[in-house]
Amino acid sequence: MTGILILTGMTSPLATAAGTMRALPRNSKSPAQKTTSKSVPPPIILITLDTTRADRMGFLGSQRDLTPSLDGLAKQSVVFTRAYSQYPLTPPSHATILTGTYPQFHQVNDMQMPLAADVPYVPEILHGFGYQTAAFLGSIVLEPHPPYAPGFNRGFDTYDSGFHDDGVGEDRFQTVQRRGTEVVAHALAWLSKHPKGPFFIWVHLYDAHDPYDPPEPYKTRYASVPYDGGIAYEDHAVGKLITQLKLRGLYDSSVIAVMADHGESLGAHGEDTHGVFLYDETIHVPLLIKLPHATAGGRRVDARVELVDVAPTLLQEVGVPIPAEMQGESLLGLMQAEMAEANPAAPLWHDRPAYSQSEYPHNNFGWSALRSLRSEKYLYIQAPRRELYDDATDPLAEHNLASSSAAVADTLGSQLDSLRHQTTNGKKATPAVLDPAAQEKLGALGYMAWTGNNAKTDADQGPDPKDKIEIANMVHRADLLQENMHASESIALLEQVIARNPTSSFYTKLGTWLMRQQDYQKAIPALRKALEMDPDSMGTHFLLGKCLMFTQDYGGAIPELEKLVAKVPNAVEAHSFLELAYARTNRLREAIGECETVLGYDATDFGSYLILGQSLGRTGDSKGALENLKKAIALQPQAPLPHAWMADVYDQMGLSKDAERERATAKRLETQ
């Protein structure tokens, strides 16, 4: 087998915005690529390092000795020293990596955003050219079904992300993420069963992501800097994969691209983690690409590149035509030995601009979005108070030159606007409806759940995130407190957030946490306040309906639940609550219909057979009632309630002995 191995987390500038020409004809071959018709395309293995800073990599100059495996791989690869991510969040950045398009084109601008079927997608393209395709994910955040990252499984024969479905308890490694070595083990198991022929594997490692909880011995070894422990552990996982590729004879023939999707602020500029700001701590990412047989191995490229360049690079390397819709540029021209040696500072690549953005602050907090352009020696950030930094003299971006160098800022601002205009597709995506369980899992990962309410307003309007970043940090800390079962502290902190920055999302989160404490009387007004601010939040309607059910306000719960199922017909849990609410309010025909709906999704639902049996009995359908109550008994033989309700039906039928028998059975089961 042959393959390409990629570790993601970097971005490339847009050539068309700079008015440049392509570095290499899109369908030309690299020197490493065989051109005979009998040649076998190399295998492709994509490994993305989530939340991994460039300055932690030994091959990029770090002295922390965290990445021996990656450093060894880098010696046989082309290393890009200035690679930049387009978005400091996992789904948008991975969408850029895999589509070769900018966020304003693929429209995956946050969590929950679907990847459109008409956007070019590397797995689907390669599958069409005979590649077998598989993905192995380290976090629920890339689960390919609503409401996480819908559409990301397009083109994959295998998309291994369902580990969280089997999770129990509160352990995050059973519910929202899994260790890197486990991800690698699944990938290797797939390789063991894989038949001959080209393949594409994507391996996603999440171990550097907060709350920075690496396994031993990394937990103890890096106790003072646990983020570094996650980096060291993910490097260990990469090493296991590389070792097995070599043992199986796959390493030499493979293309291996290693990158992070984004970095981590670690307190820089006041941001604890990532998602909001666009400084180097979260946007400058590691990127290396090993060509088959280590062609050009050891070469270092200092030209500015972007993650959007990865997809066309991979396609060109394996001889697959690059779709015209792809906006990145193939990097093979920079990697080819003769071209780089002949003109190492070619104007074509010397200063391509790099674009990045984050709409996360707008979508989730109601603040302004941020956009940036790295061009020549400058970092320009488009914000309510724009920013300009001289990267050569101020690499930490501490001295804003936007006022003193207004002409430069004006020029870069115009270039940024032009780039956005040239790379948008004119469409507007909407987030998938977020169910409460999914909302809690995103919270455990430190992310807000976007209701979509702020999509109605201009993303470039609102407070400057620089003035509000502590709010984002407080929310993140509250999420971690909630996950670690410190309920009262997390609720108190969230109430402080609401006092300073009231949004529908925060009120919904507060209502959810209060419900978890069974404090329904406080949860109800919080959820009603959320709906005042965002009447279209279906998840909040569901939470309010559920809360009202728990307080036995069935009449109040019904309209809330009805709003959800009208928009999301397959919201099975809402149908389950509705069947009970209708039954308790004597709307029996509607209760029967809801039971039948639920059973259409799950023919083993005990509660639906129970309510259906009782409701049919109350409408005079004794035969149907007994039939469904018996099905309930078959599912749960030790449950007393179906026997008690069967007794009522037998009474209606005048079968007193049968009624007495069922009541006796119900009484016996109640005492067991």
What name fits each language-model region?
Residues G3, G9-K546, F550-D553, P559, ...:
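Catalytic domains that recognize anionic headgroups
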Residues T604-M653:
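Ankyrin-repeat and related helical/solenoid repeat scaffolds used for protein-protein interactions
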